């Protein structure tokens, strides 16, 4: 009898479907496996963070394919939502683009989708204010009919780095957020501390840089603990731009959009010949703030550009620097490291979620498209637009200084190596703005063991 029971157990175990493995292109680490194991368990929210270049976006894409159950992906800005293939938080929950009050929480046209959700993935959660996280909680409770459960019983998977992208909070909003929630950051929302605990997973392996000295200095900049020696390492990279050679693929990073536009405009104007304008094709619902590049893209032969999409044939990646070599009506040719390529227009999609009655599941729908050549002028970029990019050569022009927490860290951490980094002027202690309050999550969330 014991033998028969043993055989029966073995047969039942063998009949269970095998868990899917990581998709192609994702090299799992112990941290990746720990995230997947946590989410395959029955309860709890997860906040996944990590230094620049630790693979947060790659992990999000992998988990999207592996998590069992209906999910939706949302982000705080239109461009972030397009990049992650999701929907903005404001659109998904029907929230106004301002400070959110209790009277703004209503039953939503997305109620059917919300009732089916098992997971809600929030990208760039570091930019989400406490009032918005509170609104997400309240909206899910109301629309799912589960008023006593935090987030209506939906599990949150949150990605972001509070050392890089803090929420935008005006002075008049800060007082309300401090009085109501105890602070402006997403982790101040009380629902994250109710019910099943929110856990923290900090990705440890840096993929972008391999230079131990640069990694060490970047860690100190990240934590607002920069020493005189650290500044010495960075300030040894001060060089006038003219000595680097304009032909080299340096990208100037600057804090403000006005300066970036002025630099790009001046370089483009200096090139000989007439400019050609390529108009994007926009269809359906695609907010102008989510456009990944210019709707009217002005180019000349010789223009320095940055590619904005990975190439299917792996000839370039998002962040590759190129030169425009030839322009015709609706045709663009570029040069990358001496090799010529014709570039084709690509389409970015604005997505929405819907409930498919027949299939009884949440499905993605395309609400609109933006079709354009996947590039933008790249003599200069704002530090904010460079967030998420990996660049071989970076020239940092801070001008009068930074104005936001994490800005210097984002700029410095775009570069793969110290050899590829150059500064317009010496970095000062006051350029490294660090808000200790942004680190409050470390005292709130237990750490996932790997």
Label every PLM stretch briefly.
Residues 1-450:
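Conserved ATP-binding/catalytic motifs of P-loop helicase motor domains
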């Amino acid at each position: 009898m014991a033998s028969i029971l043993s055989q029966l157990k073995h047969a039942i175990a063998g009949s269970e479907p095998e868990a899917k493995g990581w998709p192609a292109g994702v090299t799992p680490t112990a941290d990746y496996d720990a995230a997947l194991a946590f989410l395959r368990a029955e309860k709890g929210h997860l906040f996944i963070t990590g230094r620049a270049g630790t693979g947060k976006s790659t992990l999000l894409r992998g988990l999207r394919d592996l998590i069992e159950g209906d999910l939706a992906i949302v982000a705080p800005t239109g461009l972030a939502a397009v990049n992650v293939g999701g929907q903005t938080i404001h659109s998904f929950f029907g929230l106004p683009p301002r400070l959110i009050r209790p009277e703004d929480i209503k039953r939503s046209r997305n109620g059917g989708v919300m009732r089916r959700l098992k997971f809600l993935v929030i990208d760039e959660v570091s930019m989400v204010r406490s009032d918005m996280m509170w609104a997400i909680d309240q909206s899910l409770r109301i629309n799912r009919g589960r008023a006593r459960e935090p987030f209506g019983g939906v599990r949150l998977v949150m990605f972001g780095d509070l050392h890089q992208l803090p929420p935008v909070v005006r002075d008049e909003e800060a007082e309300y957020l401090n009085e109501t929630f105890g602070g402006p950051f997403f982790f101040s929302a009380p629902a994250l501390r109710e019910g099943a605990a929110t856990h923290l997973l900090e990705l440890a392996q840096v993929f972008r840089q391999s230079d131990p000295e640069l990694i060490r200095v970047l860690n100190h900049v990240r934590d607002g603990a920069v020493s005189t020696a650290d500044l010495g390492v960075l300030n040894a990279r001060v060089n006038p731009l003219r000595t680097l050679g304009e032909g080299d693929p340096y990208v100037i990073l600057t804090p403000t959009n006005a300066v970036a536009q002025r630099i790009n405009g001046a370089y483009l104007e200096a090139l000989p010949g007439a400019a050609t304008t390529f108009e994007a094709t926009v269809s359906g619902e695609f907010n102008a703030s989510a456009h990944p590049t210019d709707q009217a893209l002005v180019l000349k032969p010789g223009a320095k550009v940055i590619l904005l999409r990975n190439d299917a044939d792996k000839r370039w990646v998002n962040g590759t620097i190129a030169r425009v070599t030839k322009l015709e009506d609706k045709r663009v040719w570029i040069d990358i490291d001496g090799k010529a390529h014709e570039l084709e227009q690509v389409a970015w999609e604005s997505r929405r979620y819907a409930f498919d009655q027949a299939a009884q599941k949440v499905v993605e729908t395309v609400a609109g498209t933006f079709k354009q050549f996947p590039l933008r002028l790249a003599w200069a970029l704002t530090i904010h637009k460079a967030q998420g990019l990996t660049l071989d050569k970076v020239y940092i022009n801070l001008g009068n200084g930074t104005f936001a927490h994490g800005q210097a860290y984002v700029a410095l951490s775009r570069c793969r190596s110290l050899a590829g980094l150059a500064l317009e002027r010496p970095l000062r202690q006051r350029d490294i703005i660090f808000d200790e309050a942004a680190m409050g999550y470390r005292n709130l969330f237990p750490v996932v063991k790997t």
